[in-house]
Amino acid sequence: MNQKNIYNSWIVRILVMVLLLSFGILLDYLINDIITNQGLFTVLFLFAGMIVIEYARGGSFHTAGFPLDTKTLQEMMLAVVLGMMPIVGLIIVLSFFDLAHISYCSTFPLSGLVPIIMYAIIEELIFRGMIFQACIDRFSFAPTALLFSTIFATAHISNPSFDALSMINTFLAGLLFSFARYHMRSLWLPIVLHISWNCTLFMTGMTLSGLEISESFMKINLSHDIPSPWLMSSYGIEGTAYCTLALIVMGIIISTIDVPPQRQARIFRMEYTISS
């Protein structure tokens, strides 16, 4: 390893990113009463830190996890579909069997989507960003994915109605996002997938990670006859066996996607330069 650049050290990258994360959270906390920023500074500090450190290592925003190539748009569109279809599909099936009744709200504040989007981005930048990549460089993908998915699941433990199946599914979601990041050499897929999933739950008024949605585009009134925890739970769809199956299927679909060769080439060139 080229020791002249301190940012080639995995531990230095982690320490710098943790410091930037702390600054971002502190700023968001201090000015939240003045400006409803919804985690804006945390996102900016994490994103800017990743880009600056990657350029300092000889990389670019491409190798930092934000490649712009022929696959990027397709990757984002797939993420949107993967995030929506399991939820929309379940609603359609439940409605067909008269187990769910849909009503539409006359007013829907679009501003409610802002924290949903921002917190999904923050979680992905923390759990699948540069800290995640630095640990992969040091310990390889499998142990890193297991560790970060465990932390990701544990971070949701204080959510209402969190139980064993919710824990398993949140852990599997962490593995899914981690695999998407590693397989595609990109953060686009996990970020957009996470946003799509959360926004779909929010807009349909369904329970999101145990949290009840008070204002949404529509309201789904669910029958008490829906088998639990197979198709629904007090934690929402994320606490069901259906969600477990959906996460596994999504992982299989993602594994079939071909990674653009230019992504691999950029990373290889940077790693070759670092090691030479």
Positions of the model-derived regions?
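Functionally important transmembrane alpha-helices
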Residues: S166-P229
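Function-critical hydrophobic alpha-helical transmembrane segments in multi-pass membrane proteins
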Residues: I102-F162, A173
